[in-house]
From Swiss-Prot:
One of its GO terms (biological process) is mating type switching. This is DNA repair and recombination protein rad22. It is found in: Nucleus. The keyword Cell membrane does not apply. Residues 265-296, 429-469 are annotated as: Disordered. Residues 287-296, 431-452 have a biased composition (Polar residues). Coiled coil: none annotated. It comes from Schizosaccharomyces pombe (strain 972 / ATCC 24843).
């Protein structure tokens, strides 16, 4: 290759990066590149032999390069990729691959640094995933090694053991998430040009082309038919809340109109004739009139009344008059109330039931037994102190019930003893007889004489069994 060809290749490699730095830029870069990194940029992982290895992550290295050189002040290019080995296991088809990558980093004035990176993988299932992993790993390694040649702030300080010893004692600052630093779709800086275009387009629009019309907005005069057609065409562009209000108001007005027609049919006919003549006059003079028409919601509108008989010289009153009379409460319908099921069955479809049969949800029924020590009108916890005196009093006044409880417990114990087995048959029999005698003794504990007789019978029975044994 001749000298001219080498210069041509060198110029192509440099690209547009052939602008010399100014004195201020050079001093800034020199001071920035000589400083060492803080603890927030240093990462650690376990290395061979159980030792800790300090390194800088690839995204932090790229962020530092953009901060020091500028986002358009440096570039990287892959110079070569060499596959060192690729072994395939014939038994399971696993791939072991290793390759080296050379990356060049060029800055604004044309200066560049190259370095080598390596990527490897063992026992990978496929060739594609093996090459993908190795090429990415080798390129990232080569990029970081090329950037560290520019100075300490781009990773060269990671090879200083004394620096790593001291920076390892420092605590990195806590990370505080700031949502204001996020790049959002509504970012003003990113949408500035689009907003300017939208403003120019909105300024050229006419009022009639607006999709939404606010209340009280003035429009040019139109004929009634055209206005109705436009409302039907633009009904889909109204907001949901506005449509809901329109439909509700129309239903109310229709109900009022029916009530008004039934109440005053003659007056409605007179008003309709005058309104028709006024609309015709407005249609004839709509092109010559300069007063704008206001679009509003479908509320009851005040209609002017003509004081003269002639239609052309009609004069309207200043006092507004509504089309319909105000609503009056219907006093004939009874108010809703609760009644019992028995009263409803006795009414047999009659709406009005007698007042005595009204349902009272707070009525205390005498058929339901309730404890006197508890207030059933409120939901409160029951205190133990209020219940214990009642239990003690009942236990003192009813000894028979206590005896019955004792007898029940004795019978349960005897049943358990009888089911033990053959070894304890004599003992279970003895226990059963003694238990019955004890129960008899307890049953007659209220009478002293009967208690003595029961005791004598018990002793005699025990003596007989002892002699037989």
């Amino acid at each position: 290759m001749s000298f001219e060809q080498k210069q041509h290749v060198a110029s192509e490699d440099q690209g547009h990066f052939n602008t010399a730095y100014s004195h201020e830029e050079f001093n800034f870069l020199q001071s920035s590149l000589t400083r060492k990194l803080g603890p927030e940029y240093v990462s650690r992982r376990s290395g061979p032999g159980g030792f800790s290895v300090s390194y800088i992550e690839s995204w932090k290295a790229i962020e530092l390069a953009n901060e020091i050189f500028g986002f358009n002040g440096w570039s990287s290019s892959i110079r070569s990729i060499n596959v060192d080995f690729m072994d395939e296991n014939k038994e399971n088809g696993r791939i072991s691959l290793g390759l080296s990558v050379i990356v060049r980093v060029t800055i604004k004035d044309g200066a560049y640094h190259e370095d080598i990176g390596y990527g490897s993988i063992d026992n990978c299932r496929g060739k594609a995933s093996a090459f993908e992993k190795c090429k990415k790993e080798g390129t990232t390694d080569a990029l970081k090694r090329a950037l560290r040649n520019f100075g300490n702030s781009l990773g060269n300080c990671m090879y200083d053991k004394y620096y790593l010893r001291e920076v390892g004692k420092m605590k990195p600052p806590t990370y505080h998430f700031d949502s204001g630093d996020l790049f959002r779709k509504t970012d003003p800086a990113a949408r500035e040009s689009f907003i300017k275009k939208q403003k120019t387009l909105n300024s050229t629009r006419t009022v009639n082309n607006q999709p939404l019309v606010n209340k009280g907005e003035q429009l040019a005069p139109r004929r009634a038919a055209e206005l109705n057609d436009e409302q039907t065409r633009e009904i889909e562009m109204y907001a949901d809340e506005e449509l809901d209000n329109i439909f509700v108001e129309d239903d109310i007005i229709a109900h009022l109109a029916v009530a008004e027609d039934t109440a005053h049919p003659a007056a409605n006919n007179h008003h309709s004739e005058k309104a028709g003549t006024q609309i015709n006059n407005k249609d004839k003079g709509s092109h010559n009139s300069a007063k704008p028409v206001q679009r509003s919601h479908t509320y009851p509108v005040a209609v002017p009344q003509n004081t003269s008989d002639s239609v052309g010289n009609a004069v309207t009153d200043t006092s507004p008059k509504t089309l319909f009379d105000p609503l009056k409460p219907n006093t004939g319908t009874p108010s809703p109330k609760f009644i019992s099921a028995r009263a409803a069955a006795a009414a047999e479809g009659v709406v009005s039931a007698p007042f005595t049969n009204n349902f009272n949800p707070r009525l205390d029924s005498p058929s339901i037994r309730k404890t006197s020590i508890i207030d059933h009108s409120k939901s409160l916890p029951v205190q133990r102190a209020s219940v214990l005196p009642i239990i003690k009093q009942s236990s003192q006044t009813s000894p028979v019930s206590n005896n019955s409880m004792i007898r029940d417990s004795e019978s349960i114990i005897n049943e358990r003893k009888e089911n033990i087995g053959l070894i304890g048959v004599k003992r279970s029999l003895h226990d059963s007889t003694t238990s019955h005698n004890k129960s008899d003794l307890m049953r007659t504990n209220s009478d002293p004489q009967s208690a003595m007789r029961s005791r004598e019978n018990y002793d005699a029975t025990v003596d007989k069994k002892a002699k037989k044994g």
